[in-house]
From Swiss-Prot:
UniProt source species: Geotalea uraniireducens (strain Rf4)
Residues with site note (Reversibly protonated during proton transport): 59
Name of the molecule in the record: ATP synthase subunit c
Keywords on record: ATP synthesis, Cell inner membrane, Cell membrane, CF(0), Hydrogen ion transport, Ion transport, Lipid-binding, Membrane, Transmembrane, Transmembrane helix, Transport
HAMAP family (UniProt xref): ATP_synth_c_bact
Primary subcellular site in the record, as a coarse category: membrane
Subunit structure: F-type ATPases have 2 components, F(1) - the catalytic core - and F(0) - the membrane proton channel. F(1) has five subunits: alpha(3), beta(3), gamma(1), delta(1), epsilon(1). F(0) has three main subunits: a(1), b(2) and c(10-14). The alpha and beta chains form an alternating ring which encloses part of the gamma chain. F(1) is attached to F(0) by a central stalk formed by the gamma and epsilon chains, while a peripheral stalk is formed by the delta and b chains.
UniProt function note: F(1)F(0) ATP synthase produces ATP from ADP in the presence of a proton or sodium gradient. F-type ATPases consist of two structural domains, F(1) containing the extramembraneous catalytic core and F(0) containing the membrane proton channel, linked together by a central stalk and a peripheral stalk. During catalysis, ATP synthesis in the catalytic domain of F(1) is coupled via a rotary mechanism of the central stalk subunits to proton translocation.
Entries under CDD domains matching the protein: ATP-synt_Fo_c
Upper taxonomic lineage: Bacteria, Pseudomonadati, Thermodesulfobacteriota, Desulfuromonadia, Geobacterales
Alphabetical list of InterPro entries matching this protein: ATP_synth_csu_bac/chlpt, ATP_synth_F0_csu, ATP_synth_F0_csu_DDCD_BS, ATPase_proteolipid_c-like_dom, F/V-ATP_Csub_sf
Entry similarity comment: Belongs to the ATPase C chain family.
One GO CC annotation: plasma membrane
GO molecular function: lipid binding; proton-transporting ATP synthase activity, rotational mechanism
Length: 91
């Protein structure tokens, strides 16, 4: 398996795991907020504001995962080393 194939697989798996955690976290946050509003409708404004801030912080996990995966795919610092190693092995 080549270096670039492993980079593509790592980026795909990393993005899948990052978005899986984000989806689960956001689902749990919304579930808790809905339960809180149903128990105390008078506090809905404060609960929803806090939930939105929390969702933004949870969503940052997916953004960080995307950035790392894009770095792995397009700006990999080990690309030159891998190409030199492949040329050396080919000789």
């Amino acid at each position: 398996m080549s270096f670039f194939t492993m980079c593509v697989l790592a980026a795909g798996i990393g993005m899948a795991l990052g978005t899986l955690g984000t989806g689960i976290g956001q689902g749990l946050a919304v579930k808790s907020a809905v339960e809180g509003v149903s128990r105390n409708p008078g506090a809905s404004g404060k609960i929803l504001t806090t939930m939105m801030i929390g969702l933004a912080m949870i969503e940052s996990l997916a953004i960080y995962a995307l950035v790392v995966c894009l770095i792995i795919l397009f700006a990999n610092p080990y690309k030159e080393i891998a190409l030199e190693l492949a040329k050396t092995v080919a000789k």
